């Protein structure tokens, strides 16, 4: 591993550590999403707390946190396996943000953003999977769980060189969804509702 690769891994973690949900809620004068709704600083909970525009901005910036470091590293000629580790670092930053007392989100959007520069076909397939499951179930967490469970198979099929990092990211996201899995198994997970 070169010094450049290490620098990009560190940069990805630091960029991932910027909690878009918390920053946008502060700018909009909204409550801290870690203390409201589901308690998760992600786009779905920001929608619950503040509506469509703050949620879309949160989603956009969470995607960029994964996309920017991987894209930059790709153009710097970093090898595929290490590009995967850079994606993992961005997700770790989102989950354990340095600047926000290590209280972060679930990294679904950040992981998706990390896929686009190196495997856009896979990223589109992941989006289609999430949308299909969400359309049927109206449960955001279930859509995320099904999508991340299928992600390693998609990677092996489309971009096998990224299979190991994708497995790592999928396991991280599954681990962050432990509470959701328990609520789903007990039938207590709430379906998504439009704000009025």
Swiss-Prot record:
It is a multi-pass membrane protein. Keywords: Cell inner membrane, Cell membrane, Lipid biosynthesis, Lipid metabolism, Membrane, Phospholipid biosynthesis, Phospholipid metabolism, Transferase, Transmembrane, Transmembrane helix. The chain crosses the membrane at residues 4-24, 80-100, 114-134, 155-175. GO terms for cellular component: plasma membrane. InterPro entries: G3P_acylTferase_PlsY (IPR003811). It catalyses: an acyl phosphate + sn-glycerol 3-phosphate = a 1-acyl-sn-glycero-3-phosphate + phosphate. Its main location: membrane. The keyword Repeat does not apply. Pathway: Lipid metabolism; phospholipid metabolism. GO terms for molecular function: acyl-phosphate glycerol-3-phosphate acyltransferase activity. The keyword Oxidoreductase does not apply. SMART domains: G3P_acyltransf. Catalyzes the transfer of an acyl group from acyl-phosphate (acyl-PO(4)) to glycerol-3-phosphate (G3P) to form lysophosphatidic acid (LPA). This enzyme utilizes acyl-phosphate as fatty acyl donor, but not acyl-CoA or acyl-ACP. NCBIfam families: glycerol-3-phosphate 1-O-acyltransferase PlsY. Belongs to the PlsY family. Probably interacts with PlsX. This is Glycerol-3-phosphate acyltransferase. It comes from Idiomarina loihiensis (strain ATCC BAA-735 / DSM 15497 / L2-TR). The gene is plsY.
